[in-house]
């Protein structure tokens, strides 16, 4: 038998082959739906809806000196 050292503190370490036993099963992660459900309940709903208005300019901004050059 091995003598306990300061690094093992008397506990026997598992070798990689020992961790493949059937008793050492990994825990399954919960379904994604179950994880998202609590966060949806925490969301606050507002009384008023939010309206965003965006304006898009088709024309380029032209400097006054460029405009004069084009007209001449």
Curated annotation (Swiss-Prot):
Top-level taxonomic group: Eukaryota
Which regions are flagged for Basic and acidic residues bias?
10-35
Please give the residue ranges the record annotates as the region Disordered. Answer: 1-40
Q: Which InterPro entries match?
A: SPAN-X_fam
What is the protein name given in its UniProt record?
Answer: Sperm protein associated with the nucleus on the X chromosome N1
Protein family (similarity comment): Belongs to the SPAN-X family.
